[in-house]
Amino acid sequence: MTESVLDYMTRLGRAAREASRVIGRASTAQKNRALQAAAAALDAARDALTAANEQDLANGRKNGLEPALLDRLALTPARIDGMITGLRQVASLPDPVGAIRDMSYRPSGIQVGKMRVPLGVIGIIYESRPNVTIDAASLCLKSGNATILRGGSEAIHSNRAIATCIQRGLAEAGLPPAVVQVVETTDREAVGALISMPEYVDVIVPRGGRGLIERISRDARVPVIKHLDGICHIFVDEHADLDKAWRVAFNAKTYRYGICGAMETLLVDQRVAERFLPEMARRFQEKGVELRGCERTRAIIDSKPASEDDWHTEYLDAILSIRIVDGLEQAIEHINHYGSHHTDSIITEHQGQARRFMAEVDSASVMLNTPTCFADGFEYGLGAEIGISTDKLHARGPVGLEGLTCEKYVVIGDGQLRGQEPC
């Protein structure tokens, strides 16, 4: 009898739960050994990885996959090198598991503190890029979690080949292969099953388009770590150093158009707009960035008219909306109304303005004189990230190793009894 999708996913979930107990108590040395061995296995399997990836690329071309998606799908020699380097970098990161902090004596004589522990089983749902398989698996492994990886159907052969290398590394370190499992069915019912198994899965991390993340957030029966959009702003304050503002805003938009930390809306204080915007527009237009401005903006520079929808849009492209605001208060109101609570930055030399902006803007990262594209786990010193969260519970901002753990209380006594004074 053919195994149903639900039965298959239940089997994966049960195996992951059992494996999570093993990896959760594994030593740092054992986890690092698995990561280093997985890196060596990837290096030795370059031909097999390339062959599997060519199969996915051929299927993608046959199915009319867009060139940009085919590019994301490709495992070039440089990307394989990057995956190997990534595994070794994660192995070199400090292990958060088991760290105890804030131990203090209470009046009763007991000591109370907190210990960092793994979350358990993490489900990762993602699209296209097979290198995410390595990123997610390595971070989950190092943080003591088991993981179930459900990649896009277009990358199924690549993901299987990568998972085989990771499981070789686990075996070499004496850890169960179920610590990292790839969902090998392309049936979409697998996603519904994965997000509906709280008895086996502790948290879901979706990485993909807005539609995927909205569906998972709506239907999941387990907690979700996510962000929907990266509608990031830079506000050029009346007290800004304009040379600095030109450089920072240009970098925030043009560093990479397709990342979630790219600036999508530029807000400019009316008091500096006539001095700031012409040069800013010249730089963007030379780069080929399409500008869409409010009425006051279009009175100063040549741009297309911005609509209400533009303020809500994550372009992920060479398009920028520009609005002139009356001042700091209106800039904060705009960001909190139209933004996605991801990353927003103020350009100013006035510390009072900066403090108010950073206190009142409701985003996971708030910045001063810094391009929003710095919103990244490596740039924040986390070493690597599994994604960026705009939620307020558990993790917020770039989610690295520590974000894949939680804390439990540790209480140490010496026979104290409640209700009795300590001796």
From Swiss-Prot:
EC number: 1.2.1.41
Primary location class: cytoplasm
Subcellular location(s) of the protein: Cytoplasm
GO-annotated biological processes: L-proline biosynthetic process
Pfam families noted in UniProt: Aldedh
GO MF: glutamate-5-semialdehyde dehydrogenase activity; NADP binding
Catalytic activity: L-glutamate 5-semialdehyde + phosphate + NADP(+) = L-glutamyl 5-phosphate + NADPH + H(+)
Alphabetized UniProt keyword annotations: Amino-acid biosynthesis, Cytoplasm, NADP, Oxidoreductase, Proline biosynthesis
InterPro entries in UniProt: Ald_DH/histidinol_DH, Ald_DH_C, Ald_DH_N, Aldehyde_DH_dom, G-glutamylP_reductase_CS, Glu-5-SA_DH, GPR_dom
GO CC annotations on file: cytoplasm
Pathway: Amino-acid biosynthesis; L-proline biosynthesis; L-glutamate 5-semialdehyde from L-glutamate: step 2/2
Disulfide bond annotation, renumbered to this chain: none
Family membership: Belongs to the gamma-glutamyl phosphate reductase family.
HAMAP family documented for this protein: ProA
PANTHER family per the UniProt record, alphabetical: DELTA-1-PYRROLINE-5-CARBOXYLATE SYNTHASE (PTHR11063:SF8), GLUTAMATE SEMIALDEHYDE DEHYDROGENASE (PTHR11063)
Functional note: Catalyzes the NADPH-dependent reduction of L-glutamate 5-phosphate into L-glutamate 5-semialdehyde and phosphate. The product spontaneously undergoes cyclization to form 1-pyrroline-5-carboxylate.
Protein name: Gamma-glutamyl phosphate reductase
Organism for this UniProt entry: Pseudomonas entomophila (strain L48)
Taxonomic lineage: Bacteria, Pseudomonadati, Pseudomonadota, Gammaproteobacteria, Pseudomonadales
